[in-house]
């Protein structure tokens, strides 16, 4: 009797699982072959391949505009068509306005940042933060960025002081550069991780991006943020919160208290957050921007310490990795394309001369803006190596796929494989080649609808211009002062990483030598 009961239970579960994992086929969608209970995530679960590459693999092997996938037990849809992807992000934004990620503003305020917030809360915060990254604000922060770039230059000069060519792992060096920019511009800290790598902020950064130093519960909780937000909310309320985020909150709190107590004012993003907290808005008047810190009782809650900390943490996560990756991948590709390297280096030299600047001296915002070919290089790098290899959205109302009879059900998770689209030859001819000229006005050779490394529409990356500026500053410093040694062309291999970024298996090793 017991054996029969067990057989009935197992059979019932099997039938239920088969029905669950054939949902998309029954609804008429092309579907990735799913395994029970891992769905499309077997290689992710076994740490064989990162999630972004798994989505790109499915993109490559399937054929229809929309493909059914299973994120473990969660049915979702992968969009394989650039026009449809852009439509979801822009014209039909009202049907896909949320990301569907974990957020719990009330009980876990450090989870409530611009990236994950939903509905009116997101709209209000986006509107308030938008002025933070205007041209005037970036120009005001430029000196701080240039100070960090000078430390990068000093570090490289010290590593190459014997005048010989040396192979350096450039990604780790540029990660230090990016982290110090974030620490200074966003957290308001005076740090030099090149000289003092054991400072509190750098140590927290290493722990954050090194999953080996997190517990199994933390890793499971981080995965549930994306796969199953209700479970993440439950785990959070049971105490499974990331201690690093709260350590960073303490840093923000101490810095704000110090500034307000001592009357310290700096031209950085934290100062803008303080202004938003105290006045309810960020001024558009550049002359008053950094000094308008008077507060009123009703506006003190406009941006709490927790909200400042959570959004600082967001810009830290997004800004440090994307800046380091974009800059290092650009250097790596230039080493494999000497003719492109020569053109980029010549432009930097000419711009410095035109603006009356010296290679080892200070840069200016205007000079960086004048480096147009460097812009093309950054565009090509972010095409081939998007900072986030995929975008995600949640369908908030039933949506009919254009020119089909297919309907995307409400609450369905949507994945857009940027890596797949950006390396699709129908949108970008010869996608494996590094060709900055494909973006030049006079020789455009790509489908503009398919290029979206920072997202598109109302939820596009708010700090896009800052990230590009930070990368261009580092590139200009390196190209102006060092020779990059040519090397054979070879595609980068990526290893498994729990973070949704592209991590090279063996780093990015490039030969550098002094020019002067």
Swiss-Prot record:
Annotated phenotype, changing residue 469 to I: In allele CYP6D1v4, allele CYP6D1v5 and allele CYP6D1v1
Impact after mutating residue 55 to L: In allele CYP6D1v3 and allele CYP6D1v5
Transport found in the keyword field: no
Stored SUPFAM superfamilies: Cytochrome P450 (SSF48264)
Compartments, as annotated in UniProt: Endoplasmic reticulum membrane; Microsome membrane
Enzyme Commission number, as recorded: 1.14.-.-
Keywords assigned: Endoplasmic reticulum, Heme, Iron, Membrane, Metal-binding, Microsome, Monooxygenase, Oxidoreductase
Gene Ontology molecular function: heme binding; iron ion binding; monooxygenase activity; oxidoreductase activity, acting on paired donors, with incorporation or reduction of molecular oxygen
GO annotations of cellular component type: endoplasmic reticulum membrane
Induction: By phenobarbital in susceptible strains (3-fold in CS), but not in the LPR strain.
Keyword flag Acyltransferase: no
Effect of residue 165 to T: In allele CYP6D1v1
Result after altering residue 150 to D: In allele CYP6D1v1
Cofactor(s) essential for the protein: heme
Gene3D superfamilies linked: Cytochrome P450
Effect of residue 262 to T: In allele CYP6D1v5
Family, as annotated: Belongs to the cytochrome P450 family.
Note: Expressed at higher levels in LPR compared to susceptible flies, it is responsible for monooxygenase-mediated pyrethroid resistance.
Name listed for the protein in its UniProt record: Cytochrome P450 6d1
């Amino acid at each position: 009797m017991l054996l029969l009961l067990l057989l009935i239970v197992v059979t019932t579960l099997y039938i239920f699982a088969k029905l669950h994992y054939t949902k998309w086929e029954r609804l008429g969608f092309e579907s990735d072959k799913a395994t029970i209970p891992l769905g499309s995530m077997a290689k992710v679960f076994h740490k064989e391949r990162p999630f972004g590459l798994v989505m790109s693999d499915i993109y490559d092997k399937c054929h229809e505009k929309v493909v059914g996938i299973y994120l473990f037990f969660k049915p979702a849809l992968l969009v394989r068509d650039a026009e449809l992807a852009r439509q979801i992000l822009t014209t039909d934004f009202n049907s896909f306005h949320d990301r569907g990620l974990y957020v719990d503003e009330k009980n876990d305020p450090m989870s409530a940042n611009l990236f994950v917030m939903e509905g009116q809360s997101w709209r209000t915060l986006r509107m308030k933060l938008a002025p933070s990254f205007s041209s005037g604000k970036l120009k005001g922060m430029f000196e701080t960025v240039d100070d960090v770039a000078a430390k990068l230059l000093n570090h490289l000069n010290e590593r190459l002081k014997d005048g010989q060519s040396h192979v350096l792992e450039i990604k780790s060096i540029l990660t230090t550069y990016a982290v110090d920019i974030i620490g200074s511009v966003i957290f308001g800290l005076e740090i030099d991780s090149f000289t003092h790598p054991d400072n509190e902020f750098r140590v927290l950064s290493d722990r954050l991006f090194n999953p080996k130093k997190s517990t199994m519960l933390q890793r499971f909780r981080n995965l549930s943020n994306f796969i199953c937000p209700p479970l993440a909310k439950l785990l959070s309320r049971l105490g499974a919160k990331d201690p690093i985020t709260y350590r960073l909150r303490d840093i923000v709190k101490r810095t704000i208290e110090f500034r307000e107590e001592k009357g310290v004012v700096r031209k950085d993003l934290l100062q803008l957050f303080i202004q938003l907290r105290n006045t309810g808005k960020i001024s558009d008047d550049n002359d008053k921007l950094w000094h308008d810190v008077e507060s009123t009782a009703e506006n003190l809650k406009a941006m709490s310490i927790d909200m400042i900390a959570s959004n600082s943490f967001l810009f830290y996560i997004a800004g440090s990795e994307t800046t380091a990756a974009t800059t290092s991948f650009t250097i790596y590709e230039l080493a494999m394309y000497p003719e492109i390297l020569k053109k980029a280096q010549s432009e930097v030299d000419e711009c410095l001369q035109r603006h009356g600047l010296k290679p080892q001296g200070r840069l200016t915002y205007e000079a960086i803006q004048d480096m147009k070919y460097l812009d093309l290089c950054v565009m090509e790098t972010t095409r081939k190596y998007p900072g986030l290899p995929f975008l995600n959205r949640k369908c908030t109302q039933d949506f009919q796929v254009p020119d089909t009879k297919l309907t995307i059900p409400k609450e369905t998770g949507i994945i857009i494989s940027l890596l797949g689209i950006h390396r699709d030859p129908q949108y970008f001819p010869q996608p494996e080649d590094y060709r900055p000229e494909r973006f030049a006005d006079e020789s455009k050779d790509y489908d503009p609808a398919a290029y979206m490394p920072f997202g598109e529409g109302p939820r596009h990356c708010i700090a896009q211009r800052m990230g590009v500026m930070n990368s261009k500053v580092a590139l200009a410093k390196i190209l102006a002062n060092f020779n990059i040694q040519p090397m054979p062309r070879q595609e980068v291999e990526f290893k498994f990483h729990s973070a949704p970024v592209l991590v090279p298996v063996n780093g990015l090793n490039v030969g550098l030598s002094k020019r002067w």
